[in-house]
């Protein structure tokens, strides 16, 4: 498993499992909203009134509507008022 996947998959899985509403910002500035239905190595399936398959290489930022705990013993990821994700409890 690549090092970049060690946080990405648990984060997306927590959002999917808990059905947390998210705002997904694309690299071209477009904002998509919905819940994560599924994901794999290359795409995220985002559900709102319709399902959209969004390629991960087009995603800039994923902002959850509320705090989410990532993995066992992991930290909380929360969204702030500036639409940026913050990590409160990650060891460095």
UniProtKB/Swiss-Prot annotation:
<keyword id="KW-0346">Stress response</keyword>
<dbReference type="InterPro" id="IPR047575">
    <property type="entry name" value="Sm"/>
</dbReference>
<protein>
    <recommendedName>
        <fullName>RNA-binding protein Hfq</fullName>
    </recommendedName>
</protein>
<feature type="domain" description="Sm">
    <location>
        <begin position="9"/>
        <end position="68"/>
    </location>
</feature>
<dbReference type="InterPro" id="IPR010920">
    <property type="entry name" value="LSM_dom_sf"/>
</dbReference>
<dbReference type="GO" id="GO:0003723">
    <property type="term" value="F:RNA binding"/>
</dbReference>
<dbReference type="GO" id="GO:0005829">
    <property type="term" value="C:cytosol"/>
</dbReference>
<dbReference type="Pfam" id="PF17209">
    <property type="entry name" value="Hfq"/>
</dbReference>
<dbReference type="GO" id="GO:0006355">
    <property type="term" value="P:regulation of DNA-templated transcription"/>
</dbReference>
<feature type="region of interest" description="Disordered">
    <location>
        <begin position="72"/>
        <end position="92"/>
    </location>
</feature>
<comment type="similarity">
    <text>Belongs to the Hfq family.</text>
</comment>
<dbReference type="InterPro" id="IPR005001">
    <property type="entry name" value="Hfq"/>
</dbReference>
<comment type="function">
    <text>RNA chaperone that binds small regulatory RNA (sRNAs) and mRNAs to facilitate mRNA translational regulation in response to envelope stress, environmental stress and changes in metabolite concentrations. Also binds with high specificity to tRNAs.</text>
</comment>
<dbReference type="GO" id="GO:0043487">
    <property type="term" value="P:regulation of RNA stability"/>
</dbReference>
<keyword id="KW-0694">RNA-binding</keyword>
<dbReference type="GO" id="GO:0045974">
    <property type="term" value="P:regulation of translation, ncRNA-mediated"/>
</dbReference>
<comment type="subunit">
    <text>Homohexamer.</text>
</comment>
